[in-house]
Amino acid sequence: MKIKWEDSDGREFSIKVISREFEWSSIAGDKIRYNRSGRVKEIGPVYIKYNRGGWVKEVGSVYIKYNRAGWVKEVGNLYIKYNRAGQVKETTGTVN
């Protein structure tokens, strides 16, 4: 499952709940900056922050939280619940 959202200027962001694969798009004129590890740290005015494991933990004002298994459990105000097999069984709320 992929969770997608966009900021007020039209930049799109997404994260896959199990693999934690993070994707983004920029708009014309955006400068892309990278951290020492080579990860994107800024897309225009949007800052990207990572946890110690290298997983995205914040995109602008949207926080991303993980469960013990390392699966995404929250993206902003969107909550994700899994069954014992690791499949998404329920989502509630919205990202923003």
Model-derived features: where do they sit?
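Repetitive, compositionally biased segments used for assembly/scaffolding
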Residues: M1-N96
